[in-house]
Amino acid sequence: MALIVGFLSLETRDSAAAEHSETTYSYGSHDRQKLDAFWNASDSKRPGVVILHGGYWYEDSGWATWSRHFADKGMAVFSVDYRLNFDAPWPAQRNDALSALTWIKANAAKFDLDPDRIVVLGSSAGGQIATSLATYGSGGDRIKGVVALSPVASPYRAWNDGNHDDSTAKERKVRDNATILARCFPDPADTDASLHASCWDTWKDMVVKNRASGADDAPMYLVHSEGDFVPVQHSLDLEAAEEVGHDMPADGVTVETVTGSAAHGGGLLDTAGMPEKVITWIKARV
């Protein structure tokens, strides 16, 4: 990504018709605190989609193609990078996403964006961050909703799933990187905060359902495949915490399983009809 200081872009790519723009901006001082903005010319304010990539919290993944797709559907799109697990422990990743949102809203006029009509889309590890934005504080006041594809909504569940003799390589990779994210192994007995932040408190904070509060949280559309290595139970547990534990309306969290598929994260958008479902869900809320 090209470095942008303040509001000045070092690189802007426009379409031949000068109707489409792509620019990289910095929303913080760390090299990872950048975002790519995609938008088309508009005579009116439009809704926004903030994309948080996956990659086990430790690597990046490209979202340019889908960012352009969503921009062509009438939205201003922001593909956000954040500090990875070897850069900083949790909750730095959630803090970065919050900072990016603040920057986007403050600069909404540049993109013909309505700052009150923003949805967050997260994939895999990015889905964990995205859903945490829905439940952290009054998420419903911050954003209009979250679409999460294979969200690792419970890194603790993922740690356990990856800690068996028959665990797959991908399950172990999630386990190991969740451990790096927390900077410790999950141990309910480790509650000592005198020398460090409590390990167990960090793991509990990483589990999205633990911050569920019902009506204060943003609505969510959570999607997994039937053979996903991040199983749908992650999202079902979050749905139960919101709708059963905290009386969120029954349509506050929608969980969908794509049958006959093992697609994961952004790969779910290659499923027939899924991009249309996602766009329909977003537009119904913005």
Language model: regions and residue ranges:
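Alpha/beta-hydrolase superfamily serine-hydrolase fold, recognizing
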Residues: 14-286
